[in-house]
C-alpha cells in the first residue's frame, strides 16, 4: 500500500479524508501563503497548492519515493478581490461585510504528487455561495465565536457559518476546503480510487 501524505494541518481536510477509512500521515507544509493580487484566483489557488505539495515532497524524497502527497489551498473571490484568511478581528469584520448579502465564489486548488513517477497534477474547483445580509451586530456576534480566523473569507460553512449561508451552487466540500469529487477524479487519472478504500 502506498504511503499517503496530507500536506495540511486543517482539521476540516483531515476529517474529510478520514471518512474513507484509508491510512494517511499529516505533514503540514510551511510555505508563505501570501496572495498575489496580480494573478487570477485560479492561478493563486493552484500555485499555492503546488507549492505546499512540492515542499512536503522535497522533505520526503530522500527517504523513498513510494508515497503520494495531497495538498490544497482555498480562497474566496468577491467583486474583483481575492480573500484569504483574516489575520485579526478588523480584517474578519471587513471580509464578512464584503460578502454579506451577495454571491461570492470559493476556489480550492488541489495538487497531487505521485512519488514513484514524480508526476504532478494540479486542478481547481469552484463553488458559488450566497451569504445572507448581516447587520454589523450579527457580524460581530459571529466573529465572537472565533470561527472566522483560520478560514478563507472569514467563515466556515460547516460550523456557525452554516447559519449565514443561504444558498450554494457547486461542491459543498469545496467550500469546506477539499473538493472530494475533484480529488478522486485526479486520483483516478493516476490509477488510484478512493472508492476502493486503499491507494
UniProtKB/Swiss-Prot annotation:
It comes from the Bacteria. Gene3D superfamilies: 3.90.950.10. Keywords: Cytoplasm, Hydrolase, Nucleotide metabolism. The record marks 12, 74, 158 as: Important for substrate specificity. GO terms for biological process: nucleotide metabolic process. SUPFAM superfamilies: ITPase-like. Its main location: cytoplasm. It is found in: Cytoplasm. Its cofactor is a divalent metal cation. One of its GO terms (molecular function) is dTTP diphosphatase activity. Its EC number is 3.6.1.9. One of its GO terms (cellular component) is cytoplasm. The active site is at residue 73. It is an enzyme of class 3 (hydrolase). It holds the Pfam family Maf. It catalyses: dTTP + H2O = dTMP + diphosphate + H(+); UTP + H2O = UMP + diphosphate + H(+). Nucleoside triphosphate pyrophosphatase that hydrolyzes dTTP and UTP. May have a dual role in cell division arrest and in preventing the incorporation of modified nucleotides into cellular nucleic acids. NCBIfam families: maf. HAMAP family: Maf. Belongs to the Maf family. YhdE subfamily. This is dTTP/UTP pyrophosphatase.
